[in-house]
């Protein structure tokens, strides 16, 4: 039973290895075969992201070119400065209430919230566009060169030939093992070494207690 489980485990390991290497080789084959469509998809996605990033930059610029936004931003700045003054002045309770009323009016006008100010919105948009620019710089620009297509071709060839080579080496080694050796009582020995074959026979026979006792017993 244990011997059967060992054989089954070895078979499963070999099968998983072959399937894994076959998957790698297949992925390399399809990547090489369809490198043109893949490159086109990459180019389309790269251009879309770049286009969206440009639109976000335009929105960020247009936000502060709007007169209403400029005015609200200035009012917001004045509110923040006014609150700093009232915090250090115990006689400015009346001014503080006026600031609260003004802030309440701004909330009604444009859903104004001091925690989501226009300057913070612009900074957030700028951070997003800067991050996207940095990411785009790390990837090949398909509008300027064919680096991505070249990388795809090289990697796909490496994957394909590596997978095929390892699988081929495995089957060739297995064929040579079967061709030049044979099993004797469960032990694989060389077909071209009679002395070793004889030794293997003797060792296997002497492992049997009955044979050992018959040969060396009193």
Swiss-Prot record:
<keyword id="KW-0812">Transmembrane</keyword>
<dbReference type="InterPro" id="IPR030940">
    <property type="entry name" value="MG279/MG280"/>
</dbReference>
<keyword id="KW-0472">Membrane</keyword>
<protein>
    <recommendedName>
        <fullName>Uncharacterized protein MG279</fullName>
    </recommendedName>
</protein>
<dbReference type="GO" id="GO:0005886">
    <property type="term" value="C:plasma membrane"/>
</dbReference>
<feature type="transmembrane region" description="Helical">
    <location>
        <begin position="158"/>
        <end position="178"/>
    </location>
</feature>
<keyword id="KW-1003">Cell membrane</keyword>
<feature type="transmembrane region" description="Helical">
    <location>
        <begin position="8"/>
        <end position="28"/>
    </location>
</feature>
<keyword id="KW-1133">Transmembrane helix</keyword>
């Amino acid at each position: 039973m244990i011997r059967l489980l060992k054989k089954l485990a070895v078979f499963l390991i070999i099968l998983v290895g072959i399937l894994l290497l076959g998957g790698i080789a297949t992925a390399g084959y399809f990547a090489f075969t369809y490198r043109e469509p893949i490159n086109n998809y990459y180019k389309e996605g790269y251009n879309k992201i770049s286009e969206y990033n440009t639109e976000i930059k335009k929105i960020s610029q247009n936000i502060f070119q709007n007169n209403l936004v400029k005015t609200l931003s200035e009012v917001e700045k004045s509110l923040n400065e006014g609150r700093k003054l009232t915090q250090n002045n115990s006689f400015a309770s009346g001014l503080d209430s006026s600031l609260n009323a003004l802030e309440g009016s701004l909330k009604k006008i444009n859903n104004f919230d001091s925690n989501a100010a226009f300057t913070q919105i612009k900074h957030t948009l700028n951070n997003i566009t800067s991050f996207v620019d940095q990411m785009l710089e790390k990837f090949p620009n398909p509008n300027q060169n064919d680096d991505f297509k070249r990388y795809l071709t090289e990697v796909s060839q490496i994957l394909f030939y590596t997978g095929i080579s390892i699988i081929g080496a495995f089957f060739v080694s297995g064929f040579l093992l079967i061709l030049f050796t044979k099993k004797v009582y469960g032990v694989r020995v060389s077909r071209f070494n009679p002395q070793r074959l004889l030794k293997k026979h003797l060792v296997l026979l002497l492992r049997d207690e009955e044979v050992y006792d018959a040969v060396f017993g009193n």
